[in-house]
Structure formats: structure tokens, C-alpha cells
A protein has these predicted regions:
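Signature of N-terminal electron-transfer/Fe-S-associated modules in redox systems
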Residues: 1-155
Length: 155
């Protein structure tokens, strides 16, 4: 039995401890925000927060989340921080096709939680584990800067 907190709710699962968290989130909880991209922890499409820090759920076995807290984009989307980031992404054109957006939003939350006023370079480093083929990153960096300014006091 593996116990953990998922998007604020206590969860108990009797599954193989080597099961990938990504598969469990999508197949058992119907949480489709985390996506299968590369399956190797390189693209960030599967990003979630583990005790407030970004991790790639495609590489994370259930055994590693026992007694921990997982937040997916679905859980994060219910917060004021998410609203500030989503508004900034829309305003700055930081989201186009949407494939990377959930993971990018999780990366931005993790970054801003640790550093509420990051420089452009710190943002680029903070999102470096997330690939985006549409925006060229400049609009995403600008969106995170905008969210940090407009959401002053949220992080």
C-alpha cells in the first residue's frame, strides 16, 4: 500500500511500487495534464511538483512518492498563483500549441516558489528541463517575468 497526497487529497494505492507515476496519474486518476513526451525525463511534458519541487513523473516510480505530496497542473490550476501565470502566458503569447504548457507552468511555479523575482537567466535555467518547439522561449521567459511582477506577494 502506497500512501501519498495528490492535489490536496490523501490517496492510498495498492499497485506495483515500480509503476511510473505518470501512468498512474493518467490511467487511475484521469489526470491528463502531465503528458508522455520522451519517456526519459528530458522534455518536461510530464512535470509535476513533488513536495513543491519539479520532477518528471515519467521517471518516478510510485515507491519514491510514499508519504509525499504530488501536485499536478490540475491541482495547481485551482490557485491564485496559477491564475497569475496563466494570465501572463496569455498576455505574452507564452503558450501556443499547448503540449509543453502544463509542464512549463509547473516549472514556472517551482522556480517562482524558490525565487519570486528571478532574472531572465534564472528563468531560462529554471525552465531548461522543459522543451518547447513553438515559442523559442522568449515569450515564456517574458510571461514568467510578467507573472512575477503582477503576482507580487503570491510567491
Amino acid at each position: 500500500m502506497i500512501k501519498f497526497k495528490l492535489n490536496g487529497k490523501d490517496v492510498e494505492l495498492n499497485l506495483d511500487p515500480s509503476s511510473r507515476l505518470l501512468d498512474v496519474l493518467r490511467n487511475y486518476f484521469n489526470l491528463t495534464g502531465p503528458k508522455e513526451g520522451c519517456g526519459e525525463g528530458e522534455c518536461g511534458a510530464c512535470a509535476v511538483l513533488l513536495d513543491g519541487h519539479i520532477v518528471h513523473s515519467c521517471c518516478l516510480p510510485l515507491a519514491n512518492i510514499a508519504e509525499k505530496e504530488i501536485v499536478t497542473i490540475e491541482g495547481f490550476s485551482k490557485t491564485k498563483r496559477y491564475q497569475a501565470l496563466a494570465s501572463a502566458m496569455l498576455e505574452e503569447g507564452g503558450s501556443q500549441c499547448g503540449i509543453c504548457t502544463p509542464g512549463m507552468m509547473i516549472a514556472a511555479e517551482s522556480l517562482l516558489n524558490q525565487n519570486p523575482k528571478p532574472s531572465d537567466e534564472e528563468i531560462r535555467i529554471g525552465i531548461s528541463g522543459n522543451l518547447c518547439r513553438c515559442t523559442g522561449y522568449n515569450m515564456i521567459v517574458k510571461a514568467i517575468q510578467t507573472a512575477a511582477k503582477k503576482g507580487d506577494g503570491l510567491w
